[in-house]
Each structure stands twice: as C-alpha cells, then as structure tokens.
Amino acid sequence: MDSDFSHAFQKELTCVICLNYLVDPVTICCGHSFCRPCLCLSWEEAQSPANCPACREPSPKMDFKTNILLKNLVTIARKASLWQFLSSEKQICGTHRQTKKMFCDMDKSLLCLLCSNSQEHGAHKHYPIEEAAEEDREKLLKQMRILWKKIQENQRNLYEERRTAFLLRGDVVLRAQMIRNEYRKLHPVLHKEEKQHLERLNKEYQEIFQQLQRSWVKMDQKSKHLKEMYQELMEMCHKPEVELLQDLGDIVARSESVLLHMPQPVNPELTAGPITGLVYRLNRFRVEISFHFEVTNHNIRLFEDVRSWMFRRGPLNSDRSDYFAAWGARVFSFGKHYWELDVDNSCDWALGVCNNSWIRKNSTMVNSEDIFLLLCLKVDNHFNLLTTSPVFPHYIEKPLGRVGVFLDFESGSVSFLNVTKSSLIWSYPAGSLTFPVRPFFYTGHR
C-alpha cells in the first residue's frame, strides 16, 4: 500500500513533458502543472492563446507564478528519494558505519560526518547533501530565468530587424519617388544632382541591408547557443541530488559566458541629402504662426500609441517630463503656406497640421485620418521618425534645429523639411490634403 501511495504521489509531481519531477512548477489556466522551463520551450513559438500540452485547452494567459505548494511537495519527494538512496548499504561509511550525509566539494565524494572532520578531508569544504543540492538547483533556475529573458529579447530583436528590413525597403522606394518629384519642380532641372542623390540613397540602402543580414546571422547563432545552454541547465536541474552535485562543474560559469557579447540591433539611418534651393524656394510662402500653448500630460497618449503600435514598447512615464501641446490660431484652407519650428531642445515631438474636429474631440489617436504629423520619438537610445496617415516609419537622420512645414492646397500635399540640411524629410502624395487644417505642435522637454 505504501508503495502504491508513493508511486501515485510521485506521478502527481511529475511533468508530463519531460517525465521528471517538476522544476519551478507552474499551474496554467486549465489546472495542469508543468516545469516552467518545459512550458517555456513548448510554447516558445506557439500562437496566443497557446494550448495546454496535456489537454490542448487554450490558455489565454502565458505568464504564471511559481506554484509554491507544488514546489514544496517536490522538495519533500526529492528528500525522500535521497534518503532512500543514502540508506542503501553502499552509502554507509565502511569505517564509521554512519550514513554518508555530507558532500565534499573538493573531490566530489560523499562522506559521513566523522570522515568530513578527518585529517584527510578537514581542510576541504563540506555541505549537507540536501542543502547543497537545493542551493545549486536554485542557482541553476536563476540562471535559466536570465537566459530565457535573453532568448526572448534576442528573438524580439531578430523579428524587429526583419520587419525593419521590409519597412526600410518601402521607405527607400517611396523616398526615391519623392526625390524625383521634387527635382521636377526645379527650373532648370538639376539632373546631375538628382542622379547623385538617388545613387547615394541606393548605395546607403544596400550597405544597411547587408548590415541587417549580417546581424540576422549573428542573432540566429546566438539564439541557438542560448537555447542549447538553457536545455543543458534544464537537464542538470532534473538530476537527482547526488548526481547534480557531482556533475555540476563549471556549467554556471559557461552559461554566464554565453550571455556575453549579445548582438545589438542595427538602427538604420539614411543621410539627409540636400536639394539645392529647396528652403529658399519655399520661403516665398513663409507665414508667421501664432500658437496657443498648454502644458499637458493627457496627450502623452499620442506617443504611447506610437510606441505600442510601431515599437511594441510599454507606456511612457507621464511624470518624467512636461508636454506642451500647441494649436495654431489660424486655419488654412487654400493656397501655399510655409513655416518653421525649432525642435533642437526637444526629445519627443510631433508637428504638422490637423483638422479642427481632431482638436475638438481632444483625440490622441495616431491613426486618425484628421492629422498629418511628423513625429520624433526616442526608443531605447535611438531616435525614430514617423509620419501619420498612415503611420509609417522613416529611416532618414533626425533633423537638428528647425523643421519646415509646407502646405500646398493646390496639389493637396503636406511636406516636412530638414531646414539645416535643406533636405526633404517627407512629402505626402498629391491629393492627400482635402480639408481645412491648422498647425499643430507637441513637444516634451526633459
């Protein structure tokens, strides 16, 4: 009966994925429990919601806390197995006829208490087997959590870089067409400068794309090494106490070395090529803009939308800066108009034009069709430029100093300029602007 009970007890504490005692056990929504490492590997590429490996029921939640009760029961079961092992005749000290309860860290042997204090072993470090094994297992689990975090981070970076390559290609194609259209407006047409501009754009794109490809290879290799190390640590965690202590070796140090030299994402940046006479020509339509300013933290959602949508980042800390929203006093509905805004002392900023209805609704939806904005947003340690209607990233260098805004109701277009470089950041296609708008400026100071 005792044997049947012991078998049933062990079965309830066994992971159905690895068929070993549960390690860092978690219980998912359907009630089944698994080793956290086993579940992580099982769900690594699963769609959300992932299915339970046992009953296939979908689990809307994918992040679980350690089941402390199960963890304690597994500890009890491991102790029982250890004492059963130590009670065998082989583990009785031949000299002192005592159970070998101590582990010698120097020669990786089991000793009785009297042997551990002998002249031969007295200078060595000794630990009770139970405590030493549990402590080492916790070290392994801690290292596995760090490894898994890095595995996920590396996978996210790899996904983002492949997505960046796709978006970069789209940006370059649209930018080349935009540059051609701008040069056609010049009289006389600067054919040589246009050709050089486009050749430089294509050359930079090819160089950046090759950087991205090399980065993908590094990230793939790092992902492979991290997973191999993670699985090696997991196998070590599953070993019985004595085997764990004897086989541990330098596995923790090796796992730490794998974490070194993590590949860093490539941040593409195209050079802002100057267009001769661009700012001079638009200055003919220069207007002075009067703004109504207000300090606000409400419209910080504008940047939160972009962060979550484009970069999959968490919310900004609304306490870290003052955000100034400003609307132009004048509404434009016809003609050509040009103005400049200084963004040199701003970290996150947005500028452009918006429909009156967008202001009245106090809307912050970045995907609204009522706004034509250029946004600069700092993500990690890199600045990103985007435009709205639709939201689209641009990989041109961040403008320093003043940014120009040009409204052309005759063609139905809005353009943004890097004034310092006399270059075009972005120009909406003809026919995009079909309603009255007023200037909008939004900035955060740190």
From Swiss-Prot:
It comes from Homo sapiens. The keyword Zinc-finger applies. PANTHER family: E3 UBIQUITIN-PROTEIN LIGASE TRIM. A zinc finger (B box-type) spans 88-129. One of its GO terms (biological process) is regulation of gene expression. PROSITE patterns: B302_SPRY, ZF_BBOX, ZF_RING_1, ZF_RING_2. SUPFAM superfamilies: B-box zinc-binding domain (SSF57845), Concanavalin A-like lectins/glucanases (SSF49899), RING/U-box (SSF57850). Keywords: Coiled coil, Metal-binding, Zinc, Zinc-finger. GO terms for cellular component: cytoplasm. The keyword Transcription does not apply. SMART domains: BBOX, RING, SPRY. A zinc finger (RING-type) spans 15-56. Residues 269-446 form the B30.2/SPRY domain. Zn(2+) binds at residues 93, 96, 115, 121. CDD domains: Bbox2_TRIM43-like, RING-HC_TRIM43-like_C-IV. This is Tripartite motif-containing protein 43B. GO terms for molecular function: ubiquitin protein ligase activity; zinc ion binding. Belongs to the TRIM/RBCC family. InterPro entries: B30.2/SPRY, B30.2/SPRY_sf, Butyrophylin_SPRY, ConA-like_dom_sf, SPRY_dom, TRIM/RBCC, Znf_B-box, Znf_RING. Residues 129-158, 190-220 form a coiled coil. The gene is TRIM43B.
